[in-house]
Amino acid sequence: MAWKKTVAAAVAAIACIAGSPGAIAQQAGTQFIGITGYRVGPYGANGAAFFGGFVDYLQLINQRDGGINGIKLSGEECETEYNNAKGVECYERLKTKSATGPTAIHPMSTGITYAIIDKAPTDKIPLITFGYGRTDATDGRVFPWVFPIMSNYWDAATGIVKFIATKEGGDANLKGKKIVLLYHDSAYGKEPHAVLEAEAKKLGFELKMIPVPHPGNEQQSQWLQIRQYKPDWVINWGWGVMSATALQTAQKVGFPREKMVGNWWAGSEVDTEAAGPAANGYYAASLNLGGKGYPVVQDIEKIVYGKAKVGSNPKLIGTVLWNRGVAAAMFTVEAVRKAQEKYGKKPVTGEQVRWGLENLNIDAGRLKAMGFNTMLPPIKVSCQDHGGSGQVRFQQWVGNEWKSASDWMKGDSALVRKMIEDSAARYAAEKNIKPECMGG
């Protein structure tokens, strides 16, 4: 089967030949899944890893299981190049491709998420923003169509502060410390500002925020500021080429990578391998663990790449972002499966998938049954909490691999929840929304 690929604003669509690697073609009676992806441009390497894992998992469900309760998966991937306007164009293209819609959209871009977030309720298409997007959308009473599933940016930011505190001997020892937020100058990079300012006020550390213009491959002036400021820690809120450049430039100015912590979009092999020896010692948050030691990864290797020969790229298997793509696809599949429990074993609509997402309960037993084991923490979504976890763990790049640097942990959950509810309430007032649970 072939997964169709298109390019926004292209004269002609690019379609994969049936049976070609990484592709699943649309067929009548299937569950159509639309992907707003990117595999080219300055963020293409990151996107290729994530979406490679995403499509490989969908292939596994078709090849191993015969679909979801007998309903095969089909779909189309539209290339956005991580561009907001192209992301909107891809969204508009994909939403009409099937009688049941695109199932759920993973924008994989905070900017694209903001650009389409007000469209989702009208179009009845759920948005799954796994570890990115608009943080206050975690409050499903105000944002019933948006699911920042598992953990959000404020979970990441407060988790990083807590991790730094453990390295300094406790929260009390953060008082008077200097922390720099080196951030991608975009909606993505600005998302943690408010919560880090609140943490700085609460814990008494100095916070200096330094933007890096897109795409981030020039950082001399930023690191000159950092060298002059002499911070105790640098938080790297990077994406794409920005993260490797930050590590290499830190080495040039003599800033220790053991005092740098990336967020989970600045902590993959794409970043560290590109940085070379400059990455050694660098810490990063993570939404998921990398590695091939999970039954689900081994099934994909054996069935999708081995037997069916429809895998995306064997070199990416088990990397942090590829595993994250596998996990993201699993959330979509499990939401469809949950929706089928209520609405029947047939292709389900976006409205029905929204109910499935809001009622997801993936406990440790279910994770093990699916072959994910400890790759992810348990997740239980509700109307009030469209995240369902709030946990993060940390890893450190040592030599040529990521090694665990913590167990699953939470940052300042009380602060995060209060800020989510306050921000969501302001949005509700602005948009004249009455906060309530939709049900199904």
Where are the regions that the model predicts?
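Extracellular/periplasmic Venus flytrap/periplasmic-binding protein
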Residues: 86, 96, 135-136, 144-253, ...
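Short, low-complexity disordered leader/linker segments with a strong preference
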Residues: 1-32, 426-440
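Venus flytrap/periplasmic-binding-protein-like
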Residues: 80, 127-129, 133-138, 215, ...
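Segments of small-molecule ligand-sensing domains
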Residues: 311-322, 333-407
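Beta-alpha junction/loop-to-helix N-cap segments that form part of ligand/metal-binding clefts
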Residues: 30-32, 45-52, 59, 64-140, ...
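Periplasmic-binding protein-like
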Residues: 95-110, 126-130, 178-182, 209, ...
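Immediate post-signal peptide segment of exported/extracytoplasmic ligand-binding proteins
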Residues: 23-35, 66-72, 168-178
